[in-house]
Amino acid sequence: MQSIKDIKQLFEQAEKEQWNALFPQYKTDERAGVQKLITQYENKLLKHKKEQERLYRMLEFERKYGDEFSCICGIDEAGRGPFAGPVVAGAVILPKGLTIEGLNDSKQVSAKKREELYDEIKEKAVSVGIGMSSPARIDEINILQATYEAMRHAVEDLDVVPDLLLNDAVTIPLIPIRQVGIV
């Protein structure tokens, strides 16, 4: 009889896609530790499936525009509406069809997860651009115009020129690239 430690190691070394094939082998094992382990991995698999469904929905616009446009860039900002601090925008072009688990609006992700995602995005992206407008600039031109400015700088910072921008619910003035506002 395999030890619980060995069974756990088997699941840890297997790919998520292989877990369903492993479950029947251990479902009849009456040891509480094995049943707890099976429940943990079933829950992990369910969580993974839900994440894949969420990511699939996120790619809705890529699927919609992917045949017409070969280089699609997502752009978003952080810091809009601050009392102090800059507004920062990021523009990212990912390879078609690429999904990154945990990718979400920065406000919905922990600081630690943002750092992990940043590293993975930098590693896998076709191109990444960053733009910023300082607090002084925000005071000078207002937060909305400073946001547009940061977004323009982010697009200008890209190594590759996109042919479509997917923006966070805005149309950025003075950018001669087709834009689609998403919410």
Located regions from the model:
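Acidic (Asp/Glu) carboxylate-rich active-site/surface patches
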Residues: 1-73, 83-88, 92-183
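Phosphate-recognition beta-domain surfaces
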Residues: 76
